[in-house]
Amino acid sequence: MKKILFLAHHRIGRSPGQRYRFEQFFDFLETNGIQCYLANIINENDEKNLYHSKNILKKLKVGINSFFRRWKHLKDIESFDLVVVYREVIPTKSTLFENYISKKNIPMVFDFDDAIWVKDVSDVNKKISFLKDEKKIEKIIPLCKHITCGNDYLANYASKFNSNITIIPSTVDTDLYKPIEKHNKDGQVKIGWVGSHTTVKHFEMITGVYLKLKSKYKDKIDFVLIGDETYHHKKLGIKGLKWENKIEVELFNSFDIGIMPLPDNEWAKGKCGMKGLLYMSVAIPSVMSNIGMNKDIIEHGKNGFLPVGEKQWIEVLSKLIENKELRKKIGDSGRKTVLEKYSKNKIKKTYLDLYTSLMK
């Protein structure tokens, strides 16, 4: 059997990005004669120090430990037929490991799903941002045999440094993510957002919209935020919930409307619309900022909405709050879009064919 080594930051099942880009295809690849190995450098305790602690020494210790873990991973690298690097081998300025792999007689694939060349540092990690170099991607891409990325915008950037590029959109396991019948007896409409502690700032971008809607509809609506359990907003009655893999499909299905506000900047243009696709996969109407790949996914008013400005956000959300039939119509259309274009089952053979061709 052929063997692929996937180099990523997080353990299997921990990172949504890793799951939607490659982890969910492991079973399919293995049934087709390809063994998949994931080598991660950040454990559960490291995550607490990286994402929740402000102790710089603890963060630096995570970095040092990650460095030595990577060296161990690469000791037997020549036993693999292909190496797939997700975003970077180690989260520092260094490209030492990528250079090391490139000198071996093993093809290397670089996969990314964000505009990672743009600086975007969370508040909790600002003091160690000097250890990062967003532009190192320009040094990594030329070292690779092939590049895979999530949309045209990312591909256009990568093409400056490497011509061997395949665009593979991030996809949803539609056998897992599917609608569940709602039993919302009180008629309250739940408006949901899913993200993380580092992206909650995007949810907050349109707080003025939420406050006006809350003032208008009062207890008829409820805002739900998943992914940052430390988040609180007294006026909106929000207490953030933890993202839990075991119940994530139920969590998404608890929404009546899904939202994805984004800033209008270079970083947002690189996003692959994953939040919106997840809402759509469970037939929840998706309301997304009119930017980047969102415009490729959504046909405004048909399978979702792309409001521009506070006034349109309020108008669109008000229509959906007041009209259950519209929510169902848009939700069903969104689900159809995902099944036709962004389903794991539609994309899995693309990965198989690409990886197989690179290992010949």
Where are these regions (language model features)?
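Carbohydrate-associated surface elements
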Residues: Y153, T171
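An aromatic- and histidine-rich active-site surface loop
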Residues: H10, R14, R19, V83-I106, ...
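Membrane-proximal helix-turn-helix segments that form the acceptor-binding/catalytic region
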Residues: F67-E78, T92-F110, I116-V118, K127-I147
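Conserved acidic donor-binding segment of nucleotide-sugar-dependent glycosyltransferases
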Residues: E299-K311, K319-E325
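Acceptor-binding helix/loop patch of EC 2.4 sugar-transfer enzymes
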Residues: I42-L57, M108-E138, D173-D175, G187
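Conserved catalytic-core segment of nucleotide-activated headgroup transferases in glycan assembly
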Residues: I12-F28, L38-A39, D173-L176, N184-S254
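Nucleotide-sugar-dependent
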Residues: I90, K201, N245-S281, V287-D296
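A short, well-ordered alpha-helix in the C-terminal region of glycosyltransferases
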Residues: L326-K341, I347-D353
